[in-house]
Amino acid sequence: GLLSKVLGVGKKVLCGVSGLC
């Protein structure tokens, strides 16, 4: 649903910002 989409985008953003991926 919408929440899972938001969480998925959030994880991608955090991943890119933190440089952990």
UniProtKB/Swiss-Prot annotation:
Q: Which branch of life, at top level?
A: Eukaryota
Localization (cell): Secreted
Q: Which GO terms describe its biological process?
A: defense response to fungus; defense response to Gram-negative bacterium; defense response to Gram-positive bacterium; killing of cells of another organism
**Which tissues show it?**
Expressed by the skin dorsal glands.
User: Which GO CC annotations does the UniProt entry carry?
Assistant: extracellular region
Disulfide partners: C15-C21
State the name under which the record lists this protein: Nigrocin-2
The scientific name of the source species is Pelophylax nigromaculatus
